[in-house]
Amino acid sequence: MQAVKCVIVGDGAVGKTCLLISYTTNAFPNEYIPTVFDNYSATVMVDSKPINLGLWDTAGQEDYDRLRPLSYPQTDVFLICFSVVSPPSFDNVSSKWQPEVSHHCPKTPCLLVGTKLDMREDKEQLKRLEEKKITPITTEQGEAKCKDIGAVKYIECSALTQKNLRLVFDEAVRAVISPAGGAKKDKKNNRGCLLF
């Protein structure tokens, strides 16, 4: 069975851990606790193929900038996450996360993931954003950022409602087992990211 290592990166509090917990347990955590989610492994079916999917959560806070890359070796695909209701987290995709990932793992595919999709229409959230004179990130902005950073796909999702949640992880697996460029990766000779 093919194994796929998927590492999730992005600013603190954009919903990375909620994404993983909702996907793996079908339950949404009610409180924010900075990353305590351990590595998770599950057998999933993608395009009728069994895949051993390893999910690695990372801390987004600056305090962990030197430790976070230790989880990158052997990564097959990255999910670069931002919250659609946090323009600063969106800006950090191109100023921090894509440069960090491409520095350590230049040939590893990335998906851009807009989280908290359910909050884009939330009246309370929109009021808070309006008070700060900012607006939610649009789908078009996400798609443009995807092209700008060279990500293979842009997907918006909600861990709360689970809208597009499974799609995020299915597409992450597809980026590894069926890359758009044609030939599949030879797992023996090209195993994702290597750090020396």
Curated annotation (Swiss-Prot):
Keyword Ribosomal protein assigned: no
A GO CC annotation given for this chain: cell projection
Molecular functions per Gene Ontology: GTP binding; GTPase activity; metal ion binding; protein kinase binding
Names of the cofactor(s): Mg(2+)
Residue ranges annotated as propeptide in the record: 194-196
Membrane-topology descriptor: Lipid-anchor
Residue numbers binding GTP: A13, G15, K16, T17, C18, Y32, T35, G60, K116, D118, A159
Localization of this protein: Cell membrane; Cytoplasm, Cytoskeleton; Cytoplasm
SMART domains linked: RAB, RAN, RAS, RHO
Residues the entry annotates as binding Mg(2+): T17, T35
Top-level lineage group: Eukaryota
Motif placement: Switch 1: 26-37
Residue interval(s) of motif Switch 2: 57-75
Activity regulation, short description: Regulated by guanine nucleotide exchange factors (GEFs) which promote the exchange of bound GDP for free GTP, GTPase activating proteins (GAPs) which increase the GTP hydrolysis activity, and GDP dissociation inhibitors which inhibit the dissociation of the nucleotide from the GTPase.
Listed EC numbers: 3.6.5.2
Lipid-modified residues, S-geranylgeranyl cysteine kind: C193
PROSITE patterns in the cross-refs: RHO (PS51420)
Broad class of where this protein is predominantly found: membrane
Function: Small GTPase which cycles between active GTP-bound and inactive GDP-bound states. Involved in cytoskeleton remodeling. Plays a role in phagocytosis of bacteria and host erythrocytes. Involved in capping of surface receptors. May be involved in cytokinesis.
Quaternary context: Interacts (GTP-bound form) with PAK2 (via CRIB domain).
Family: Belongs to the small GTPase superfamily. Rho family.
Domain remark from Swiss-Prot or TrEMBL: The switch 1 and switch 2 motifs undergo large conformational changes during GTP/GDP cycle and play important roles in the interaction with downstream effectors.
Name of the molecule in the record: Rho-related protein racA
Organism: Entamoeba histolytica (strain ATCC 30459 / HM-1:IMSS / ABRM)
